A protein has these predicted regions:
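Conserved, structured core segments of small domains
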Residues: 1-123
Length: 123
C-alpha cells in the first residue's frame, strides 16, 4: 500500500534551531532517506516552497479565481511530503515517526486509494 506522509512545518521552529542542529537534522534526513530507499519503501519526496510563493485556485460558476498565498492562515503549513510504499499503516506511522521533522512538527499519514477503490475505472 502507498501512504502519503504530509510534513507540516512551522518556519519559526526551524529558525529557532542553532545552525549546527539544523545541519545535524539534514544529515539525519539524508541517512533516513537512504535507508528507506534501500528497503524499497521510498517512492518519492520533496520539500515545498514557502507559502509566500503559493497560489490558491477556485472555480465558481465557470469563473476561475486565483489568489496569492495559501488557503488558510496558520503558523503551520505543508512543508513537504514523502510517498512511501509499505505493508501497513503501522509501518507507515513508524516511518513518519523517524522523520527528523517529527521531533518538532506534525506528520500526517494518509493511505492513498487506488482508482478502483475510489470508484473510478482503472486506466
Amino acid at each position: 500500500m502507498k501512504y502519503m506522509l504530509l510534513i507540516y512545518s512551522n518556519p519559526a521552529n526551524w529558525a529557532a534551531l542553532p545552525e549546527a542542529e539544523q545541519g545535524g537534522l539534514m544529515g539525519e534526513y539524508g541517512a533516513f532517506t537512504k535507508e528507506i530507499t534501500e528497503s524499497g519503501e521510498f517512492v518519492s519526496g520533496d520539500p515545498l516552497s514557502d507559502t509566500s510563493t503559493a497560489s490558491t485556485v477556485r472555480v465558481r460558476a465557470g469563473s476561475t479565481d486565483v489568489n496569492d498565498g495559501p488557503f488558510i492562515e496558520s503558523k503551520e503549513h505543508m512543508g513537504g511530503y514523502l510517498l512511501v510504499e509499505c505493508d501497513s499503516l503501522e509501518r507507515a506511522t513508524e516511518i513518519a515517526a523517524r522523520l527528523p521533522e517529527a521531533q518538532y512538527d506534525p506528520i500526517e499519514v494518509r493511505r492513498i486509494m487506488d482508482r478502483v477503490e475510489f470508484g473510478m475505472e482503472a486506466q
